[in-house]
From Swiss-Prot:
Residue span of region B: 337-552
Gene that produces this protein: htpG
Ranges where the record places region C: 553-624
Keyword field: ATP-binding, Chaperone, Cytoplasm, Nucleotide-binding, Stress response
Keyword hit for Cytoplasm: yes
InterPro entries: HATPase_C_sf, Heat_shock_protein_90_CS, HSP90_C, Hsp90_fam, Hsp90_N, Ribosomal_Su5_D2-typ_SF
GO molecular function, one term: ATP-dependent protein folding chaperone
Self-association state and partner proteins as the record states: Homodimer.
Major site of localization recorded for this protein: cytoplasm
Family: Belongs to the heat shock protein 90 family.
Chain intervals for the UniProt region annotation (A): 1-336
Official protein name in the record: Chaperone protein HtpG
Length: 624
């Protein structure tokens, strides 16, 4: 063979092969699904390229994948007449993994085989799955549009290296031959191979054929029998497609091992004509938070595959949705640039977004347990929605779930509709608090009065929550109110103050002035409050000022953070406040005020500028 060379696998490939062979062995038959799926993709790519270059078909436009086996040689071969590969493409696709974040993904793998199996399945094993059942894999391929002597040979035993060389191949496409390991004879059984193809590949539009041999008049006659329906699943009516077929098709397009949570199959006619098949996965992809994570729908135009990962049809906060759209209105030569500026795309995006939100609303209504699975996997992503999509903000708000003082659990199970249904008579606002953790939110002194009054508070502790709430201003006509803000509605909740208490407060006015003078412009204001029951003091911000949590978000993003000026609120009924007010010695008075302020700031921010000074001051006051 000409141009033969032996090359080493990229280190990640070696690691993936090892993990895959051991983790996926219990579900080893999926290798055939993966290889047929790749062949289907190769046919799709050829059809697309041939739209502008019909000569790529080379007079052979009947695309198919063929499966054959040789019991004597113990080989199984999967051959297609799709797009094929050049030498450079073979090295890129079969010698390396081009996915960003692969190294981090592999490092995250543990020793739990069931968990590893799910993770690797999520990653998408594709071609490498052949090594689950084969101890050697041989590939012969010729790219469409090149001469017969520009074909490529690739071979590996799945260890540390592979061989690549130039060969001659008359027909276009890729032929993969698996040299089966000892003990894998089931894949040389005609009935077994047929049943696997029927199970996993019935929905593929590409005909999958199996070799049949018949002895006639002393001659062996070879023919090819189509095994699958070979009709694009989404073109069939919903009543014709079983749940198992929908699930199998999802696994084909998503390269996922797990069943989807739900799906929606719709054909729309009228002003715009299109078919959509949208799926909600049951688990998040391993690289969902990776900047380079590819997402979007498969795009077909008049049943011709155009592109993968067409992100223009789904907003970013729904990037977990998998599926396809088949449009009759877009041109066959559509590009990503044309999609970006097309009014057809914008209309389709709007319709598909509404479809997904309706699908999720139905899931939440019909199966709370499944919806909770969805929320645990994708809730953080959905929380990006109120900021990104003001047109659908109300629909998104219905889908949000929160922890709450009502459930006394960190689990985010409470909907806004649940909250509103439990609002007290005369309660006009939906109260919430944001914090760094559920524990910090739950124990915040800002909740004291509301707990006493039996008023529910939503406990928000995800990093995105403060940002989300800056866009989400009301639900069902009820305004949202942060309990960490200085708001009249919170003061009004306090019991009516009797005359003697009013007189006591009046007597504390000089004390409040002393505190103001001492603290100067370090705080925005000093005042007495009736919002507290057990805590001597808190700090709050005005409704129109940046909150503590938002300031933390800015800082984490490396942005300049404007100074937050707090309102210092003191509980006139607390013994520490009374003791401070009675202190005449100015030095002692200063220490007590500083201690109260530090306590309030620490409760609000979780940190202090000078914690050592705080400890020194507290120790000194404890022994004085």
């Amino acid at each position: 063979m000409k141009g033969q060379e032996t090359r080493g696998f990229q280190s990640e490939v070696k690691q993936l092969l090892h993990l895959m062979i051991h983790s996926l062995y219990s579900n080893k038959e999926i290798f055939l699904r993966e290889l047929i799926s790749n062949a289907s993709d190769a046919a799709d790519k050829l059809r697309f390229r041939a739209l502008s270059s019909p000569d790529l078909y080379e007079g052979d436009g009947d695309l198919r994948v063929r499966v054959s086996f040789d019991k004597d040689k113990r080989t199984l071969t999967i051959a297609d007449n799709g797009i094929g590969m050049t030498r450079d493409e073979v090295i890129d696709h079969l010698g390396t993994i081009a996915k960003s974040g692969t190294k981090a993904f592999l490092e995250s793998m543990g020793s739990d085989q069931a968990k590893d199996s799910q993770l690797i399945g999520q990653f998408g094993v594709g071609f490498y799955s052949a090594f689950i059942v084969a101890d050697k894999v041989t590939v012969r391929t010729r790219a469409a549009g090149v001469s017969a002597d520009e074909a490529v040979f690739w071979e590996s035993e799945g260890e540390g290296e592979y061989t690549v060389a130039d060969i001659s191949k008359a027909d276009r496409g890729t032929e993969i031959t698996l040299h089966l390991r000892e003990g894998e004879d089931e894949f040389l059984n005609d009935w077994r191979v047929r049943s696997i193809i029927s199970k996993y590949s019935d929905h593929i539009a590409l005909p999958v054929e199996i070799e049949t041999r018949e002895e006639k008049d002393g001659e062996t006659i070879v023919s090819w029998e189509k095994i699958n329906k070979a009709q694009a699943l989404w073109t069939r009516s919903k009543g014709e497609v079983s749940d198992d077929e929908y699930k199998a098709f999802y696994k084909h397009i998503a390269h996922d091992f797990t069943d989807p949570l739900t799906w929606s199959h719709n054909r729309v006619e009228g002003k715009q004509e299109y078919t959509s098949l949208l799926y909600i996965p049951s688990q998040a992809p391993w690289d969902m938070w990776n900047r380079d994570h590819k997402h979007g729908l498969k795009l077909y135009v008049q049943r011709v595959f155009i592109m993968d990962d067409a992100e223009q049809f789904m907003p970013n906060y729904l990037r977990f949705v998998r599926g396809l759209i088949d449009s009759n209105d877009l041109p066959l030569n559509v590009s990503r640039e044309i999609l970006q500026d097309s009014s057809i795309t914008r209309n389709l995006r709007s319709a598909l977004t509404k479809r997904v939100l309706q699908m999720l609303e139905k899931l939440a209504k019909d199966d709370a347990e499944k919806y909770q699975t969805f929320w645990k996997q994708f809730g953080l992503v959905l929380k990006e929605g109120p900021a990104e999509d003001s047109a659908n903000q109300e629909a998104i708000a219905k889908l949000l779930r929160f922890a709450s003082t009502h459930t006394d659990s960190a689990a985010q199970t409470v909907s806004l509709a649940d909250y509103v249904s439990r609002m007290k008579e005369g309660q006009e606002k939906i109260y919430y608090i944001t914090a760094d953790s559920y524990a910090a939110a739950k124990s915040s002194p800002h909740l004291e009065l509301l707990r006493k009054k039996g008023i529910e508070v939503l406990l928000l502790s995800d990093r995105i929550d403060e940002w989300m709430m800056s866009y989400l201003t009301e639900f069902d006509g009820k305004a949202f109110q942060s309990v960490a803000k200085a708001d009249e509605s919170l003061e009004k909740l306090a019991d009516e103050v009797d005359e003697s208490a009013k007189e006591a407060e009046k007597a504390l006015e000089p004390f409040v002035e002393r505190v103001k003078t001492l603290l100067g412009d370090r705080v925005k204001e000093v005042r007495l409050t009736h919002r507290l029951t057990d805590t001597p003091a808190i700090v709050t911000t005005d409704n129109d000022e940046m909150s503590t949590q938002m300031a933390k978000l800015f800082a984490a993003a490396g942005q300049a953070v404007p100074e937050v000026k707090y309102i210092f609120e003191l509980n006139p009924d607390h013994q520490l406040v009374k003791r401070t007010a009675d202190t005449q010695d100015e030095a002692q008075f200063k220490e007590w005020v500083e201690l109260l302020l530090d306590q309030a700031l620490f409760a609000e921010r979780g940190t202090l500028e000078d914690p050592n000074q705080f400890i020194r001051r507290m120790n000194q006051l404890l022994v004085s």
